[in-house]
A protein has these predicted regions:
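Flavin (FAD/FMN) cofactor-binding and adjacent substrate-gating region
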Residues: 131-210, 215-225
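Conserved beta-strand-loop-beta-strand element in the redox core of flavoprotein oxidoreductases
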Residues: 215-236, 242
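Dinucleotide-binding Rossmann-like beta1-alpha1 core, especially the glycine-rich loop
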Residues: 81-166, 175
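Active-site substrate-recognition segment that forms the wall
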Residues: 52-57, 116-122, 237-241, 246-384
Length: 408
């Protein structure tokens, strides 16, 4: 499995409340009312987004549980930059159609919603590769014949001209790709997440954060359904509808029958000198699906975030019953081979930064599905349980839209 993007979306799981637009499963579960008790497990991107959009639609009894306050230390959304683009991940016609709907609505949210608009940066996005195999995979992500906004790049000097002179000094060996001049860029993930949580609270959502009071230890399985959750302090949280949005930790609460695999990616920050920051400001997102990607420096610290491209890491642990699963853990370090990949990317693009020390490093966990499509639906057996998981490294774009609408 190859991660090819990070996107960000905030409407996600509430599309499953009142309409059937994205239904893949129907049931006879009773409809909720505006005053029904709604419980969300997880206050990361999708959990917080779901809470916000439920509150915006008038639901008055919404509670969110998480072992950390927003932004959670282990949330993939607790990050500076996430790519915003409408790129595809499949050749399947039905999946393409759904992705286009989600991407269009999410992008409209980033561009027009007053809550999210301040955090979106329309810098443009380069999508590229440097081998025949990579170019074939790039052909799934980018369809230049369908988008006049794309400019084809084939020569090193074309890549270097994407930024002011002195920024992209590399040789770009073998690189070929397409540059989206507008309608793509990045969002400040952490700030958008915090803003969404604050707005949800203002609208009446109750956030219960910290350990033990916010750490869910089990769902309440009762009468062949899910009726809420139990936290580490022993408190029972009963609900008419439970939303499971626990990110990479979601498999610890439910058997997903090998549909999900928590996978870790690696990222670093490189600090610029104060006098360098203006030169690098507003550069487009530079993404090679075989090498990695990086962004313009953040305004607060003047640091460039860089991610290397690789199949991802797992942490396989065997439980007492013999079950083996990948268990996420927090770590502000990356493996040595990941550092080598980051520095190789910099040598090809910005060699002047290739030997600088990292000011920050982290592994970032996502719940991956086999085809990188989201798993958002009512559970086929537990009809009061709504799943919002399988973000697959690209669910962050959905912060700005209401994906669970219709699933409750």
């Amino acid at each position: 499995m190859n991660r090819t993007s990070h996107s960000f979306d905030f409407h996600s799981v509430t599309d499953f409340l009142n309409n059937n637009r994205f239904h893949t499963h129907q049931s006879n579960v009773m409809a909720v009312t505006k005053s029904s008790s709604l419980l969300i497990v997880g206050a990361g991107t999708w959990g917080t987004s779901t809470a916000l959009h439920l509150a915006r639609r008038g639901y008055t009894n919404v509670t969110v549980l998480d072992p950390y306050p927003v932004p959670s230390a282990i949330s993939a959304g607790n990050d500076v930059n996430k790519i915003i683009s409408s790129g595809q991940y499949t050749n399947n016609k039905d999946e393409i159609e759904i992705n286009e709907i989600l991407a269009e609505e999410a992008f409209n949210g980033w561009k027009n919603d007053p809550l999210f608009k301040p955090y979106y940066h329309d810098t443009g996005l380069l999508m590229s590769a440097c081998s025949q195999e990579g170019l074939e995979r790039l052909g799934v992500r980018v369809r230049p014949g369908e988008d006049p906004n794309l400019v084809e790049l084939t020569r090193p000097e074309q890549f270097r001209k994407l930024a002011p002179e002195g920024v992209l000094q590399g040789d770009f060996p073998g690189w070929k790709g397409y540059f989206a001049r507008s309608g793509a860029g990045w969002a400040h993930a952490r700030n958008a997440l915090v803003a969404a949580a604050r707005e949800a609270q203002r609208l009446g959502v109750k956030f219960v954060a910290g350990t033990p009071q916010g750490r869910v230890v089990t769902l309440i399985f009762e009468n062949n359904d899910v009726k809420g959750a139990v936290t580490a302090d022993g408190k029972i949280w009963r609900a008419e509808r439970t939303f499971l949005c626990a990110g990479a930790s979601v498999s610890q609460f439910l058997d997903f029958m090998n549909q999900l695999r928590p996978t870790a990616w690696t990222l670093v920050h490189v600090a610029l000198k104060p006098e360098e920051r203006a030169l690098y400001k507003n550069i487009p997102v530079i993404f090679n699906i075989e090498r990695g990607f990086f962004f313009e420096p953040d305004e607060e610290r003047g640091e460039i975030k860089i991610c290397d491209e690789h199949p991802g890491y797992t942490n396989m642990v065997q439980s007492a019953d013999g079950t083996v699963m990948s268990i996420p853990f927090e770590k502000t370090q990356i493996p040595k081979e990941a550092e080598a990949r980051v520095r190789a990317l910099l040598k090809e693009t910005m060699p002047q930064l290739a030997d600088r020390p990292f000011s920050f490093a982290r592994i970032c966990w996502c719940a991956d599905t086999a085809n990188r499509e989201f798993l958002i639906d009512r559970h086929p057996q537990y009809h009061s349980l709504v799943l919002g998981c399988g973000a697959s490294g690209r669910g962050k774009t959905l912060t700005s839209r209401d994906v669970t609408r219709g699933k409750s």
